[in-house]
UniProtKB/Swiss-Prot annotation:
GO molecular function annotation: ATP binding; proton-transporting ATP synthase activity, rotational mechanism
The protein's assembly and partners: F-type ATPases have 2 components, CF(1) - the catalytic core - and CF(0) - the membrane proton channel. CF(1) has five subunits: alpha(3), beta(3), gamma(1), delta(1), epsilon(1). CF(0) has three main subunits: a, b and c.
Protein name, per record: ATP synthase gamma chain
Function text: Produces ATP from ADP in the presence of a proton gradient across the membrane. The gamma chain is believed to be important in regulating ATPase activity and the flow of protons through the CF(0) complex.
Membership in a protein family: Belongs to the ATPase gamma chain family.
NCBIfam families xref list: ATPsyn_F1gamma, PRK13426.1
GO cellular component, as recorded: plasma membrane; proton-transporting ATP synthase complex
Gene Ontology BP term (one): proton motive force-driven plasma membrane ATP synthesis
Keyword flag Thylakoid: no
Amino acid sequence: MGSLKEIKVRIASIRSTQKITAAMKMVSSAKFHHAQTQTEHTLTYANKLSAILNGLLSAECDLDSPYTEQRKVSKVAIAVFASSTGLCGTFNANIWKELSATIQTYKNQQIEVGLYPIGKKIADELHKAGYSFDTDFVTIGEKPSYESAVSLANRLMELFVTGKADRVELLYHHFKNMATQVVTHKTYLPLSLSDTEAAETATDYILEPSAEELRNRLFPKLLNLTIYTILLDTSTAEHAARMMAMQTANDNANDLIQQLTLQYNKTRQQAITNELLDIMGGAAVSS
């Protein structure tokens, strides 16, 4: 059992840390609500665009394009989304675990893997593990923007169209609710419209200027929006995870303060009791 002074110092230290975690939770809360609103708006637009393309597909329009070409897979590119800062629980660890398993699976199948990390934490893990990776997009998730999403999407589309990758995959966290961020692994290219929102009803379309022109414009736009939505979704999930981590830290601090306060009171009571016994013992001797 520590001295009264030691216990008081520990309580003061924990309360100081608690103020920091509370401030970080408030900052993450503001960023979370902003990212969530942006995600919802962008996702609505992306889903509507997907529905239009599915409607064209159901009307038997010719939507074949370089982005839908199915090939034998010998080279895979993986864009993996994480955070650039810590203190967000198991957020980055879960992504790294899934990525490590995926890389090993492809190694066993003798499939070449190209890595495109978004987030300093996942880039650090890849570096420590000795993997080579593209460093051009590591920081674009810190302040998600449509322009940065387009730059990444263009790189991934170029890899696929030029045959440098036979499949492009995305690995990220999808925000489900405050307590749950789901690790999601999906194929980005070749584009499969059957994986997107289906149109409610089949409709006869009159296409102007042409199906080819629509393909050339809508497919890249959908692929750009997909990356942008994932950047925002990852940001939303990250801030939600950090809020939960800071809340857990705050709760643990409260529990520890209660335990130390109880220990302080017991120690103080014991010290007072000992002093009284010494006084009573001295009085008995003098009498």
